[in-house]
Amino acid sequence: MAHKDSVDVALIGAGVISTTLSVMLKQLQPDWSQVIIERLDTPGAESSDPWNNAGTGHSALCELNYTPEVNGKIDISKAVGVNEKFQVSRQFWSYLVEQNVLGDPSEFINKVPHVSFAQGMDQVDYLKARYEALKDHPLFPNMQYSDSDEKFAEFLPLMARGRDFNNPVAISWFDEGTDINYGALTRQYLDAVTAQGVEVRFGNEVKNINRDGSKWKITTKNLHTGDTSMVTANFVFIGAGGMALPLLQKAGIPEIKGYGGFPVSGQWLRCTNPELVEQHQAKVYGKASVGAPPMSVPHLDTRVIDGKKGLLFGPYAGWTPKFLKKGSYLDLFKSLRVGNLPSYLGVGVQEMGLTKYLIEEVLKDQAARVESLREYMPEARAEDWELVTAGQRVQVIKPIGAPKFGSLEFGTALINSNDGSIAGLMGASPGASIAPSAMLEVLERCFGNRIADWAPKLREMIPSYGTRLSKDANLFNEQWDRSQKALKLV
């Protein structure tokens, strides 16, 4: 396909975020030309591919950091919000499968129970209170709870073997949780849009983004030939993971002023021993250690990748100044500006607990990592587990006023120019799980004058569009049943 010099839409990054928007725009505006620019030679290789992330369909079914205890009560507002956004994803994927835009859904989504795990009386009391707070909510149907040692051993044999049950345990669970291969989903997205004429430029790195009247001129370098080229776009979306911050800075929009990025590297322990893999059929999330950040929540997961099952435990965090797994050690330093130095310094002073946690994680050797695993799997053996490096997670540093100046945000942040001609998604979890919801926000912020015209198509793709599913149990149940069938989860 010949390179276009001018396009309606340029998307930077060929991971699950940009490709979600590409597919969405092709449904809404099939006549718009698009180009996707990717510095690597394959899609999703930085963060979307399966061992770069946990593959959890984040819907707050089991992730305890979404249900904090505040003044003795469980606050479920974050859990409800994340769940609603994941239902948008399920509806969008179901529509695309029904329209044959996507292929076999079992290539990217599979049923795996989601389990919350508590150990010690304080955690057990918390988990029981969480269960009571969620069990009657329409978005959390069929939630189950048990503090029986026998039920624990029956459901989680790998975690029960060798465990001292004098220390009380409890679990709550949903049988209808999911494991998602976002790399496979990304490739299905790309197959769909390239068949509709979208150009994908692999091995091309964006060197600059400049205003060109009402448009944007993007300068790219072919990393194989060294050749540079330019493409002009009416609208630019930056879905480039950790590089969203530097690229928005290159664009020079005032909205990015003061923002920074705090890179955290992730690692997993992976097990592919069939004998062990068959004894664990769940994603089991525990509680983060006191003082540890939300991203440190440990979990022992079943993964389903290319039809094969494996186990994952982690995450183990580390620190590097790189903004990408395959980035530069200068990334962080190049992002420093006079305008964001107060934000960085403010976070540095406030987040001493995070600094301590990262130092401890960096110093862990394999023996220490396996010792952490044994809190979940008491009889774990080091020889059954290998260390795998995950994608970089660049947490958002948001500018705030004195006296703190900067705030570390454990989530995602959408930054867009005032005229809506350029936008970028920064941050990490829940990221890929809620990509369709995040891209709807891009459309609403950047194409507000078209939303009314697009509304019928948006409701066709996402029937709950414009509705709070938490306020409409009938619509939730209807769309849940539909997506269960469409995505082959029953």
Curated annotation (Swiss-Prot):
Domain of life the protein comes from: Bacteria
Listed cofactors: FAD
Pathway(s) per entry: Carbohydrate metabolism; tricarboxylic acid cycle; oxaloacetate from (S)-malate (quinone route): step 1/1
GO terms (BP aspect): tricarboxylic acid cycle
InterPro entries named among the record's database cross-references: FAD/NAD-bd_sf, MQO
UniProt EC number: 1.1.5.4
One of the Pfam families matching this protein, by short name: Mqo
Substrates-to-products reaction catalysed: (S)-malate + a quinone = a quinol + oxaloacetate
Family indicated by similarity: Belongs to the MQO family.
Name of the protein this chain belongs to: Probable malate:quinone oxidoreductase
Organism of this sequence: Corynebacterium jeikeium (strain K411)
